[in-house]
Amino acid sequence: MKAGFLLDVNVLIAMAWPTHRDHQKVHEWLARHARDGWATCPLTQTSFVRILSNPAFSANALTPTDALTLLQANLAHPAHRFWADEVSMIDSLKPLAQKLAGHQQVTDAYLLGLAIHKRGKLATMDRAVRTLLPDKNPERDFVVLI
């Protein structure tokens, strides 16, 4: 199996939340790409539980326990891989630091750095992630927009 795709939290949420506007699009993408493997990491898993259990996310927000149960059910997929945080924040941001323009990019930059470190790709619906790398940088191929 290839290194696969690290799913950004926006992809994880759309995958698991049936009323999410991108639920169908993410499932169609996964149907084409899941065979290459897909991954989560502690940061994406934590963010998933935090967001789905936040009443500001949905009037139907889950309890943290229910969000964990939903996460666990999705992670049972045979193509799922867990990527440990094997690279420090500082090391993962080194190639991206010059392009960081604000605090909202820090998490995306870390996830991209982890994907590069693992020789996988970051699958996201956030087009701004590609701006973390210069236009002609071959590492832009490490970002897959869904």
Question: Can you say where each PLM-predicted feature lies in the sequence?
Answer:
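Acidic, PIN/NYN-like endoribonuclease modules and their adjacent C-terminal/linker elements
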Residues: V87-A101, L112-I146
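A generic structural signal for short hydrophobic patches within well-formed alpha-helices
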Residues: L12, Q45-F48, V129-R130
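Amphipathic coiled-coil/heptad-repeat helices and related helical stalk/stem segments
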Residues: V26, T107-D108
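Acidic catalytic patch
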Residues: P18, A39-T46, L68-L100
